[in-house]
C-alpha cells in the first residue's frame, strides 16, 4: 500500500509525496530546480522522493521530508508511494505513470526530434498530466503551478482519475492476445 511504500524510502506515510525523476542518467534542469525548490515544497507540506540519476553531482540526502538518491531499484514502490510526479517524458515512464493513475508534470527532453512531446500528448489532452518545456521548469513554475496543484486534493484526484483513464493497465494481456491471434 501507499503508506508502506513511503516508509520503504524513509518518508512519512501520511504526507503528500512528489516523485521526481529524470531517468537513469538524470536531468540537470529537473534536478537543479527541485534542489532550489526544497523549502517551498516543504513549507507547503509536500515531501519529495528525488531520484536524481547517475550523472548528477548532487549528494544523496535522507531528511524528514526530502529523500534524494542516485538510483532506485524499486520504481514500483516509488510510483506507489507518490501522489504526483515530475519527470522526463519517455514512453515507458508515461505509460507506467498513466497505467496506475499517477498524475505528472512532464518535462520533455529538449534535444531530439520531439518524440517526448508526442509521448505525453494523449495524457495531457486527457487532463492526466501537464507538459512544461525544459527552459520553463523553474523555481517559479514549482511555486506558482505545482505547489498549488499538488496541494489541492480535489484537483489531484481528478487528474489521477484522468491519467488512469488514458493509461493502459492490461498491455501485457493485449499483446498476448495479439500474438495468439497471429499464430
Kindly give the residue locations of the regions a language model identified:
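A short, well-ordered alpha-helix in the C-terminal region of glycosyltransferases
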Residues: 7, 155-169
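A short acidic/histidine/glycine-rich donor-binding loop in glycosyltransferase catalytic cores
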Residues: 104, 122-135, 147-148
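Conserved donor-binding/catalytic loop of nucleotide-activated donor transferases
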Residues: 80-82, 98-107, 126
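Short acidic/histidine- and often glycine-rich active-site loop of Leloir-type glycosyltransferases
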Residues: 96-99, 114-126
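Conserved donor-binding loops in enzymes that form glycosidic bonds
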Residues: 22-24, 165, 178
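Donor-nucleotide binding loops and adjacent catalytic segments primarily
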Residues: 3-7, 11-87, 94, 117-121, ...
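Short hydrophobic beta-strand element within catalytic cores of glycosyltransferases
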Residues: 87, 103-113
